């Protein structure tokens, strides 16, 4: 399970070191293999352990090829999906098109979402989280969805 937001750096070759606390799980359950693709609604990447990525692929493949919206979703998400493998130093390499989509430069945020990570440029992340908090502070924010939710 991946939780929390961690500041990380992209090196000159387009690699990022996965924080040590996550490496054992990724190595043990997925042999260090992950799948990265674009988020279709946000300027970030989605980084899944390989087994979770396979589950997402099955869902995408189940969509209709005859529905234009579903076909676009398949094209974008599967077309950008790239298998990545952690190297001996725990780094993952992001391809040029993936880095371009998320506007990745040196400073990044690795954001745990339990079953996956979101990868954000630090600038985009801070803008997005400020907007999310502002919207979340309104009285009617997701009121129906949160009626039965408790922490």
From Swiss-Prot:
Keywords attached to this entry: Cytoplasm, DNA-binding, Repeat, Transcription, Transcription regulation
Gene assigned in the entry: mraZ
GO cellular component: cytoplasm; nucleoid
Localization of this protein: Cytoplasm, Nucleoid
Positions of the SpoVT-AbrB domain: 5-52, 81-124
Name used for this protein in its record: Transcriptional regulator MraZ
Alphabetized GO MF terms: DNA-binding transcription factor activity; transcription cis-regulatory region binding
Family: Belongs to the MraZ family.
GO biological process: negative regulation of DNA-templated transcription initiation
Coiled coil: none
Membrane-spanning ranges: none
Zinc-finger among keywords: no
Subunit structure: Forms oligomers.
Keyword rRNA-binding: no
